[in-house]
């Protein structure tokens, strides 16, 4: 996997990463974020969990060491999530893990940026910029806004 760069912003701007670019052959990824909470929605088998797995390698680099991952295999999910500060939190299988208490935590936790692989967004404070889908064009993967005005 080859890093192409990550543009970080200060926490006061509420985005830990504004952009994450990298290559994982045969694909190149250019992921741009416009909101503190980003939902990646879509049907099964569209690459969401694959992207989550790529983040597990990417977070080992100096450039992307603020990435923290959670999924259904995470022990003590609730207590571990509450400990995380100033990070880019990625949660896979959010429909299984995220209940109303976690949604409230995410809403009021201004120190972290969240990337959620989640279908049910009821209870989250979101903007239209929060709703995204993975988009593939040739071997280039991006996150596109779901609602374009």
Predicted features along the sequence, with ranges:
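N-terminal pre-Walker A segment at the start of P-loop NTPase domains
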Residues: 2-29
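Phosphate-binding P-loop
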Residues: 30-35
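Hydrophobic anchor at the beta1->P-loop junction of P-loop NTPases
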Residues: 40-42
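Conserved glycine(s) of the Walker
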Residues: 46-48
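Post-Walker A alpha-helix
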Residues: 51-52
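Post-Walker A helix-loop "phosphate-sensing" segment adjacent to the P-loop in P-loop NTPases
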Residues: 57-67
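Conserved nucleotide-sensing/catalytic segment adjacent to the nucleotide-binding pocket
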Residues: 73-123
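A short helix-turn-beta junction within AAA+ P-loop NTPase domains corresponding to the substrate/partner-engaging
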Residues: 126-149
């Amino acid at each position: 996997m080859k890093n192409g760069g990550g543009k970080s912003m200060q926490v006061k701007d509420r985005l830990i990463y504004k952009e994450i670019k990298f290559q994982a052959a045969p694909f190149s990824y250019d992921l741009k974020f416009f909101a503190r909470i980003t939902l990646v929605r879509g049907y099964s088998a569209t690459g969401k969990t694959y992207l989550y797995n790529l983040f597990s390698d990417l977070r080992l680099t100096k450039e992307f060491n603020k990435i923290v991952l959670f999924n259904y295999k995470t022990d003590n999910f609730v207590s571990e999530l509450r400990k995380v500060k100033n990070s880019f939190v990625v949660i896979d299988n959010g429909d299984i893990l995220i209940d109303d208490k976690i949604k409230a935590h995410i809403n009021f936790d201004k120190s972290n940026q969240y990337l959620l692989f989640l279908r049910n967004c009821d209870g989250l404070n979101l903007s239209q910029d929060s709703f995204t889908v993975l988009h593939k064009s040739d071997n280039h993967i991006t996150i596109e806004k779901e609602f374009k005005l």
